[in-house]
Amino acid sequence: MFKKILIANRGEIALRIIRACKEMGIRTVAVHSEEDRESLHVKTADESVCIGPAQSSESYLNIPNIISAAEITGADAIHPGYGFLAENSYFAEVCESCNIKFIGPSKEAILKMGDKVQARAIMRKAGVQIIPGSEGVISTVEEALKLVKKIKYPVIVKAAGGGGGKGMRIVQNEDALKNAILTAQNEAKRAFGNPEVYIEKYVEEPRHIEFQIMADSKGDVVYLPERDCSIQRRYQKLLEESPSTFISDKLRKKMGKAACRAARAVKYVTVGTVEFLVDKDGDYYFMEMNTRIQVEHPVSELVTGIDLVKEQIRLAAGERLDVDQDDIQVQGHAIECRVNAEDSEKDFIPSPGKITKFIVPGGPGVRVDSHIYTGYTIPPYYDSMIAKVLPYGHDREEAIIRMQRALSEFIVEGVKTTIPFHRRILENPYFKKGEVYTNFIQKRIIEEPNSKQ
């Protein structure tokens, strides 16, 4: 087992990893930008090292400085968390060359799943259903037109090396196709340095269902109950829950086994997430694999009792899985609301600033993961998430009631937050019935109230 882990991240995930390490008897090193000197992860770790100025490119994305910090402090492993360098295959390679263990999959697995075109080809070969579309990169408009004649409109143009909604365009007709390809290529080039795009059939009103997997170095893979991440705004998740109201036991097993096949196809080790789109008929299609710990991993922890961060560390250290598939069962229901420092009344613009009061909810069945405290100043340079509120209930109804109570107790003063917006979601009758799709926010929260006026 590792003796000292450097956490190459900040905020709540850095704090989450430090807590897991403490329980495992592993010493920790926090890295931080000049802006983050007073952050909670810096105060909580055994050691801390400043790695650069506030801008991420000069600190949390600065590979030489992070490696130097690990070597100076004698860390034998680096945990990348999520975001920043978590899915950077070059960083994983550099760690390996410096004899520092990267807590994640191999650089090869990251590369294969990071290239969406290559990932589709691998999944096709592994027998995992993919959305009908191009077999490779689309180079010309003529090539695109030929393909679309087969799969029909609507289609979606996607960046080959992208994610998070960038480099994506939905196309309803031939007139819009050429412009969509050029726009997506330019956006992908700016965001990812790679202008390549591919085309898929656009699945209308799908659910976004993902499966957490755990895999060891001997090739054993297990899946956890699904997470429903359909509540999104501009492809960014706002609320996740487990289990899904739509997924039957039979479908869960089929999709879970498909997720395991996906992991085995790239010889995946540690924890990861396989994401699917599921249509109204229950047909499911591979979308992508996230080769890291997810923001929403606590949802799965609550319904299984498995500490995913500890398991990630154990598996990276070469230990075997200590659970069989039959040991993993759905227990109750959990929901996560991502609370951001944003003004939902002004198109969700970030709201950085000093927190003058911060009181988190508590009571039975309520977990809050946060790095915020009264007096802390939220910097404008990073992600705006300030807390994850996670109620657990014996069933979905109890989990929703507990979330409503928790959000009503949550006091944040000094900045705007998305708490009022989350409360609107929870009060929506369609959400309560479990009728959620990826266009839920636009259709049921934004457009529907306006249509009644």
Can you annotate each of these PLM segments?
Residues V29, H79, K101-I103, I131, ...:
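Structural detector of well-ordered beta-strand residues that form the stable sheet scaffold
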Residues E47-V49, L111, I131-V137, M168-R169, ...:
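Structural signal for short hydrophobic segments within the conserved structured cores
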Residues I122-I131, Y153-P154:
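A polyampholytic, Gly/Pro-enriched intrinsically disordered region
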Residues M1-K125, I138-K146:
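ATP-binding N-terminal substructure of ATP-dependent carboxylate-amine bond-forming enzymes
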Residues A159:
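N-terminal nucleotide-binding beta1-loop-alpha1 segment
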Residues V31, G81, G133, E200, ...:
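A cross-family glycoside hydrolase active-site/sugar-binding cleft signature
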Residues I7-R16, A20-E23, S48, E71-T73, ...:
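ATP-dependent carboxylate activation and anion-phosphoryl transfer catalytic cores
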Residues L147-I156:
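Acidic/histidine-enriched active-site and ligand-binding environments that engage anionic O-linkages
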